[in-house]
């Protein structure tokens, strides 16, 4: 993928070169998007809209830390959807990892989470955030133990893993495809910013319907699909049950009981 690759300090250039090589990113001086390496972190910026600010992954602080501490634990909707309220601590494959927030919530509640992200820029941001989180005194130990990242398209990876005799199937496959956002729907400033940047960089997941069948083949217990409250069912398939919040809905497709 091509975008501007910028270092805030020349001393960081070898590190940025390594990131570009790892994620197959090439510099394009004319791109409106820039991946910027600072001394603190890796950031994505939309240069033609500087007021949007930088997008980066911070699993140790900010809103993510607040949600971990005060978000409701196993009683919150995502935990119920994944079956944690049944007394289980399932293994999870997050097929649309994005910036890793939902995966982090599940990991903070004890789940081992394998994250899959197909966009190389998003994967680079997530990898950087994960690396920093693993060094954090408070959360580093369990993040290292429970969270891992695979850079691949779930459209390929889910089917490939399902047919791999040596791969241990996860209890739960979690999907949160990017969905076109109607202008008349309100979002928080942060989500609005991220959606604007991501949808112009990545585009909506117009092929998301094709994820459900391989996800059901891979998950031993259930597939959880996060949808906006106004969205139709993934691939038009009615879920076994749905858990609703103010703005979202978790559609749950049950393969087997959690016990």
Curated annotation (Swiss-Prot):
S-adenosyl-L-methionine binds at residues 101-102, 117-118, 153-154, 176. It catalyses: guanosine(1516) in 16S rRNA + S-adenosyl-L-methionine = N(2)-methylguanosine(1516) in 16S rRNA + S-adenosyl-L-homocysteine + H(+). GO terms for molecular function: rRNA (guanine-N2-)-methyltransferase activity. Its EC number is 2.1.1.242. Its main location: cytoplasm. Keywords: Cytoplasm, Methyltransferase, rRNA processing, S-adenosyl-L-methionine, Transferase. It is found in: Cytoplasm. GO terms for cellular component: cytoplasm. InterPro entries: 16SrRNA_methylTrfase_J (IPR007536), SAM-dependent_MTases_sf (IPR029063). Specifically methylates the guanosine in position 1516 of 16S rRNA. HAMAP family: 16SrRNA_methyltr_J. Belongs to the methyltransferase superfamily. RsmJ family. PANTHER family: RIBOSOMAL RNA SMALL SUBUNIT METHYLTRANSFERASE J. This is Ribosomal RNA small subunit methyltransferase J.
